[in-house]
Every structure is written in C-alpha cells, then in structure tokens.
C-alpha cells in the first residue's frame, strides 16, 4: 500500500514532507499537494486566523484525500483534534535568524532600518532589543522574503532558521539568534505528522519516525500557549530542553513595542511536563502576562 502524504505546495513544505516520506521507508509513500487558504490569501496571518495553513490539510486527511498530513507544528491550533493521531519526528534547529544586507547583525543595523516580519513574537523581541528600528509586515515564501533584502526594499528579514536550512540556504543567515536573547515560537523547528486516529496502518508508519524527546519538548511548549489562551500568532515565546530526565522550560510574553518582557524558567521531571507548563503559565500571569496579551 502506498501512503499519500498531504502537503502544502511551497518549496519548504514539499522539502519537509519529502524528508518525512524518505524517513518512512520501508513504508511506501508519495506526496499529494493541497492548496490551503493561507497560500492564496496574503493578508497578515493574525488577521486571517489560526489554522490558516492547516485546516485544508486536515480536511483532506479527514475525508480520505490523503493518509498522512505534514504541518509545521507551530501552525496548528493548540487544542488537540481527536480525529487525528499526531507524532513529532526529529526536530530541526529551533532558533530564529536574521538575513540582512551587507552581512550585518541586528546590533549593527542603523537606526531606522526596515526589518521584515509579520509575527508579533518576532516584532516584540526585535523592538525589545532595538527600539530604534522599524518592523514591516511580510508574507510569502522564503525566496519572496529574502528577495526584499536583495532588492534593497528592506534592510533585513527574520525567518525560522530551520526553514532556511531545510531548503539548503542556511549559510545565507547573517545572524542566528541566541535563544537567551530571542526565544523561539512554541514548537518552532518541529514538524507535526498526522494520520486518522482509526487508520492502524498509517499510525504504525508514522509511529516509526516519532522522536519522543522532540515530541515532549514541543508539546510542553504548546501547553503554555494553550493555557495562556493565546493563538499561534500571539507575542508568546517558549522553549523546552530535556537532559537526564529533567525538563527545563523557558517562556516569555513580550509587549508588541518591546517595552515590557515577562519571562520565567522552571524545571521538573519529564513525566510532569504538563504540570510544569501550567505552573510556569501561572507564574507568567502573576507577573503581568495577561495584561500584555489584553
């Protein structure tokens, strides 16, 4: 049986899904391109809604148009969908990166520099580090975004480093941000591979590529987002690491103008990952996170 893998049609999406297809061997699989609302609507993601890139893929999966769907985990709604079984394969680099003119870093950009990004989490952290630069809304694929720098329209853009490396352009980053200074989105760099919950063969296939450490870290990060009742476009950042059975979770909520940052870090045994995320969320709220999120 050949499994059909539903994917968006962009270079990044088909590259990511191609890696999943290859990793599934000896299970036979092929890619099926699915057009999503987010691919045809260039309005800011925070305006057109959570799930804009994932809803069409999930509908195709639910109705049998494909057997497996591959998403960027950070794009999925934070509530689990009982119709599907989800696994996280080995995680790519979770950091954000800058692609700037003349090889510049964020610190080296001149006052008033134009930086392309539409993500509130990125805007808020850029403004916290460099309140004197301007952030410009930006949508489109990697080539489109980076082309704005090459053409001189923008001084820099901020992208997920994982996406850049997946399409073989990681060496074009002029700065890869230290997560101590610039926390990633919950589950950034992680893929979510789904199949129908009642499809035993597809479940067996995708379970073979599950990375338990990547899954527990990414899921824990997303619990913070869920408990804050914030969508994937909110100015919320989180990252978890697992060492010798201890899970360390760092999360932050940042005002859009960078004027206020609420950040906390806690650790707990990995078996208590959900409780850890909930405790950290309560600490963020106690420190004023809810006020920032409105």
From Swiss-Prot:
Transmembrane segments: none annotated. GO terms for molecular function: hydroxymethylbilane synthase activity. GO terms for biological process: protoporphyrinogen IX biosynthetic process. Pathway: Porphyrin-containing compound metabolism; protoporphyrin-IX biosynthesis; coproporphyrinogen-III from 5-aminolevulinate: step 2/4. Keywords: Porphyrin biosynthesis, Transferase. It catalyses: 4 porphobilinogen + H2O = hydroxymethylbilane + 4 NH4(+). GO terms for cellular component: cytoplasm. It is an enzyme of class 2 (transferase). SUPFAM superfamilies: Periplasmic binding protein-like II, Porphobilinogen deaminase (hydroxymethylbilane synthase), C-terminal domain. Belongs to the HMBS family. PANTHER family: PORPHOBILINOGEN DEAMINASE. The porphobilinogen subunits are added to the dipyrromethane group. Monomer. Tetrapolymerization of the monopyrrole PBG into the hydroxymethylbilane pre-uroporphyrinogen in several discrete steps. This is Porphobilinogen deaminase. The gene is hemC.
């Amino acid at each position: 049986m050949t499994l059909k893998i539903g994917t968006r049609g962009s270079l990044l999406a088909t590259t990511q899904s191609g890696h999943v297809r290859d990793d599934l061997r000896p299970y036979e699989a092929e890619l099926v391109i699915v057009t999503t609302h987010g691919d045809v609507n260039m309005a800011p993601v925070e305006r057109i809604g959570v799930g804009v890139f994932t809803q069409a893929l999930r509908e195709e999966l639910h109705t049998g148009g494909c057997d497996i769907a591959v998403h960027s985990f950070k794009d999925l709604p934070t509530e689990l969908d009982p119709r599907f079984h989800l696994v996280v394969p080995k995680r790519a680099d979770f950091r954000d990166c800058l692609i700037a003119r003349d090889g510049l870093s964020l610190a080296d950009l001149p006052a008033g520099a134009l930086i392309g990004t539409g993500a509130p989490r990125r805007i808020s952290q850029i403004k916290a580090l460099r309140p004197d630069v301007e952030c410009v809304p930006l949508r489109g694929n990697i080539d489109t975004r980076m082309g704005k720098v090459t053409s001189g329209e923008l001084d820099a853009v901020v992208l997920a480093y994982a996406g850049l490396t997946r399409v073989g352009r990681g060496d074009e980053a002029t700065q890869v941000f230290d997560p101590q200074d610039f926390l990633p989105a919950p589950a950034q760099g992680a893929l979510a591979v789904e199949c129908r919950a009642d499809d035993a063969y597809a479940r067996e296939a995708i379970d073979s590529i599950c990375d338990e450490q990547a899954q527990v870290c990414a899921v824990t990060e997303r619990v913070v987002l869920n408990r804050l009742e914030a969508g994937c476009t909110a100015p919320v950042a989180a990252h978890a690491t697992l060492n010798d059975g201890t899970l360390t979770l760092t999360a932050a909520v940042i005002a859009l103008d960078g004027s206020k940052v609420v950040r906390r870090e806690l650790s707990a045994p990995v078996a208590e990952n959900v409780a850890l995320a909930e405790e950290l969320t309560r600490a963020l709220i106690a420190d004023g996170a809810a006020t920032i999120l409105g």
